[in-house]
A protein has these predicted regions:
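Sec-dependent signal peptide recognition
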Residues: 2-9
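C-terminal motif of bacterial Sec signal peptides marking the signal peptidase cleavage site
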Residues: 15-17
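Calycin-type beta-barrel ligand-binding domains and close structural analogs
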Residues: 19-36, 44-51, 56-178
Length: 178
């Protein structure tokens, strides 16, 4: 049975304000793959629709690439999903790395929350360092010179993501697998 592969319009997350880590806290973890491969329709709060292809790759990860013709055609992310300790089972951490960057150890990883809403749906909560400063400070993390919140380790990241979940921030994107 096909399930949703909810996925992240992360191009905007690559700018200042995002939550990131260079320490790669999930490097040795196998991701959770709760979704089938397939075609994704993503809708933002502005009702703009973007289409992606999702496929499973090694180590419990996914590769998501944009299928709409245009400037970003073929660009995408490697995605991993992980349980968030202390949160309900339908709340997952997402980790995203841009495919157009080298796979070296210093490639930044971006983080947020994915809420599984149905067998074929999900929503994304994308943290912003400035707007979600209270949640980031839960682990003692503050904005750096580039405006992004860079977490020192996995424990700090998870503590702040749990605080973000508890803040009841509204999701910014919805995803449906077709």
């Amino acid at each position: 049975m096909r399930k949703l592969a909810p996925f992240i319009l992360l191009a905007a997350a690559l700018v200042a304000g995002c939550w990131q880590s260079v320490s790669r806290p999930y490097r040795s973890e196998t991701g959770i793959q709760p979704f089938a491969a397939g075609e994704i329709t993503a809708t933002g709060r502005d009702h703009k629709v973007t289409h992606y292809a999702l496929r499973k790759i090694t180590r419990g990860r996914y590769r998501m690439t944009q299928t709409d013709r245009g400037q970003d055609f073929g660009q995408g992310f490697e995605l991993g999903f992980f349980a968030l300790p202390g949160a309900p089972s339908h709340v997952l951490i997402y980790q995203a790395a841009a495919l157009d960057r080298p796979a070296s150890g210093d490639n930044l990883r971006y983080y947020g929350l994915l809420l599984i809403t149905a067998p074929n749906g999900a929503q994304e909560i994308r943290p912003d360092c400035e707007k979600d400063a209270r949640a980031a400070r839960a682990s003692g993390t503050r904005a750096g010179k580039d405006g992004a919140c860079t977490f020192a380790d996995r424990a700090a990241l998870e503590k702040s993501l749990l605080d973000l979940w508890k803040s009841k921030k509204r999701p910014e994107y919805s995803y449906v697998l077709r």
